[in-house]
């Protein structure tokens, strides 16, 4: 493999060796970006790490319909999602999260304002007193190494670690092949068999089963737009 590809592989190995779960936090307010969630899920899939999507701020009425729709879509394509209220129901939220994070090293990611810090403080109350600064390469292409903080919960009432990524906002996925993308997007891949051409990229080709599924309402239009944004940069055709 090329040097760049080798570097990506090493980053993937490093991440997989240290992290057991990727936790993606979002909330109805401030306005969340579904593409951030989807990019994080794709990155976790590519790294071979299980992912848990955490919908926070469930107590908010504003934007609740959009957040609930996002949860339904994620669940419909097989993703693991839980809904919590770190501020409204802190004890219940903590118990539910500990149940999922027990015994694991969990990476916490999310857009600014989604309540990630509140969740971190619920999980590791002594977080500010016991931090270890380090850099973690999120195996997502160029310029993705970010400062991260590792918090051990062994002194509390549960065993595990939480890795926070303050200020981390973007996942670069330019290194992914079309096969990588399709493997991580089963809702798109399910319709590939209907394509007229074996090397269809599901972009502008005639007789595309994926585009037909979008037109028939069988594939979410926003998901297809997300797929297109990645596929135009993909470096290989499907096998």
Functional labels for PLM-detected ranges:
Residues 60-112:
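Canonical P-loop GTPase G-domain recognition
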Residues 1-5, 9:
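Single conserved hydrophobic/aromatic residue that forms the stacking wall/gate
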Residues 11-80, 188, 205-234:
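Conserved C-terminal guanine-recognition region of P-loop GTPase G domains, centered on the G4
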Residues 4, 18, 102-103:
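Alpha-helix C-terminal capping/helix-to-coil transition sites in glycosyltransferase folds
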Residues 28-31, 57-62, 87-91, 157, ...:
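Conserved nucleotide-binding/hydrolysis micro-motifs of P-loop NTPases
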């Amino acid at each position: 493999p090329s040097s760049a590809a080798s570097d990506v592989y090493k980053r993937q190995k490093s991440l997989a060796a240290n992290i057991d779960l990727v936790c993606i936090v979002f909330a109805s307010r401030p306005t969340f970006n579904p593409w951030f969630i989807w990019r994080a899920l794709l990155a976790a899939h590519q790294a071979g790490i299980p992912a848990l999507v955490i919908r926070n701020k469930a107590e908010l009425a504003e934007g609740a319909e959009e957040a609930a729709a996002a949860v339904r879509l994620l669940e419909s394509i097989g993703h693991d999602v839980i809904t919590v209220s770190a501020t409204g129901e802190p004890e219940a939220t903590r118990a539910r999260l500990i149940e999922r994070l027990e015994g694991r090293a969990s990476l916490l990611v999310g857009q600014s304002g989604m309540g990630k810090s509140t969740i971190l403080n619920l999980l590791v109350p002594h977080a500010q007193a016991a931090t270890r600064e380090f850099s973690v390469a999120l195996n997502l292409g160029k310029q993705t190494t970010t400062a991260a903080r590792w918090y051990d919960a062994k002194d509390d009432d549960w065993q595990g670690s939480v890795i926070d990524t303050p200020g981390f906002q973007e996942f670069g996925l330019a290194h992914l092949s079309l096969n990588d993308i399709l493997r991580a997007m089963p809702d798109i891949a399910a319709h590939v068999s209907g394509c007229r051409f074996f090397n269809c990229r599901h972009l502008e080709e005639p007789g595309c089963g994926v585009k037909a599924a979008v037109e028939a309402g069988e594939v979410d239009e926003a998901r297809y737009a997300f797929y297109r944004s990645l596929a135009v940069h993909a470096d290989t055709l499907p096998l």
